[in-house]
Amino acid sequence: MYTTEEKARIRWACRRGMLELDVVVMPFFEECFDKLSEQEQRDFVSLLECDDPDLFTWVMGHGRSENLGHASMVDKIVAHNLSKVR
């Protein structure tokens, strides 16, 4: 479990250098983070340490992370955002 202060830091890390990532990562954090398992939360936090170009490539489906935790988390982020447009 993350403390309120740690979650505030994670929320800040969701703010990316690319607007395209902001609109998919931040809503996922706000709406789903607390529902994730502890391992999934760790994977999400680890994913935020990745470079924006890599994260953008994965979210857009033009590549896939070799890190299985990251790949799984990207799948969850994409699925969450797709569910909002259907």
Curated annotation (Swiss-Prot):
Keywords: Chaperone, Cytoplasm. It is found in: Cytoplasm. GO terms for cellular component: cytoplasm. SUPFAM superfamilies: YgfY-like. Transmembrane segments: none annotated. One of its GO terms (biological process) is succinate metabolic process. The keyword Chaperone applies. Pfam families: Sdh5. InterPro entries: SDH (IPR005631), SDH_sf (IPR036714), SdhE_FAD_assembly_factor (IPR050531). An FAD assembly protein, which accelerates covalent attachment of the cofactor into other proteins. Plays an essential role in the assembly of succinate dehydrogenase (SDH, respiratory complex II), an enzyme complex that is a component of both the tricarboxylic acid cycle and the electron transport chain, and which couples the oxidation of succinate to fumarate with the reduction of ubiquinone (coenzyme Q) to ubiquinol. Required for flavinylation (covalent attachment of FAD) of the flavoprotein subunit SdhA of SDH and other flavinylated proteins as well. Belongs to the SdhE FAD assembly factor family. This is FAD assembly factor SdhE. It comes from Vibrio vulnificus (strain YJ016). The lineage of its organism: Bacteria, Pseudomonadati, Pseudomonadota, Gammaproteobacteria, Vibrionales. The gene is sdhE.
